[in-house]
């Protein structure tokens, strides 16, 4: 998510003094909210990104007061977005990993080639197989129809797990973390799998509604540039529909 878009979402969907949750904070751009008198709980799975977030927090603390707002506080913790016990927030704002990766040998991913091969990722989120962005996508109808299992032994068990099943648990955790009348704002983008566009925004709406959220609004932002890997893919498959929008989905708790 771009920083200008994130700031717009912060200003539009939260107010000074609110606690904003980002359960997949990456390098911590959500910390910009602290310079706008909001408070932040930032959760990130991987240590290297936690360290980036901590470094960015130091910079925000240095330059934030110059913007003329009172500074909010931030809590940064390493953890899994599927386990958010003890968190309470007014708003959740984040961009889930949306599988915009190019893989070889992954039957469930873009660029699949052959059976039984190990995936070779050209642009993965991480080398950690438990990272949700690295899981095979899954089937939305199967996930919605299945019971929502929260047993601790299933968290992080990547065998048979899918992106959709994992994200359903994340959204359920966010639903439980939000105060009454809280909001969850997601920025998602369709992606291409097997030369077909997968409309992640539609599947995401179904996942969120299945755990209790009410869908409120949808906006989109037209993308003017493709990623490097997506540009290469487009050249190789010129007939495949271009993904040129990202969607902002707003849900009520």
Feature-to-residue mapping (PLM):
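Class I S-adenosyl-L-methionine-dependent methyltransferase catalytic core
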Residues: 1-253
């Amino acid at each position: 998510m771009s920083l200008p878009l994130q700031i717009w979402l912060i200003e539009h969907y939260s107010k000074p003094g609110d606690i904003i949750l980002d359960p997949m904070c990456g390098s911590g751009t959500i910390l910009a909210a602290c310079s706008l008198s909001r408070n932040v709980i930032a959760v990130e799975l991987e240590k290297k990104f936690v360290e980036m977030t901590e470094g960015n927090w130091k910079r925000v603390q240095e330059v934030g007061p110059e913007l003329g707002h009172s500074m909010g506080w931030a809590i940064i913790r390493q953890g899994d977005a599927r386990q958010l016990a003890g968190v309470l927030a007014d708003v959740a704002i984040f961009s889930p990993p949306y599988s915009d990766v190019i893989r070889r040998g992954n039957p469930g991913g873009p660029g699949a080639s052959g059976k039984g091969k190990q995936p070779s990722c050209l642009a993965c989120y991480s080398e950690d197989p438990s990272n949700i962005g690295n899981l095979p996508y899954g089937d939305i109808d199967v996930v919605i129809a299945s019971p929502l299992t929260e047993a601790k032994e299933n968290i992080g068990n990547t065998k048979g797990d899918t992106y959709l099943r994992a994200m359903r648990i994340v959204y359920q955790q966010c639903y439980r973390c939000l105060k009454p009348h809280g909001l969850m704002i997601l920025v998602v983008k369709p992606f291409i799998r097997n030369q077909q566009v997968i409309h992640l925004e539609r599947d995401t709406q179904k996942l969120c509604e299945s755990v209790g959220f009410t869908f409120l609004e949808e906006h989109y932002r037209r993308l003017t540039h493709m990623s490097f890997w997506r540009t290469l893919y487009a050249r190789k498959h010129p007939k495949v529909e271009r993904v040129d929008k990202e969607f902002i989905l707003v849900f009520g708790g």
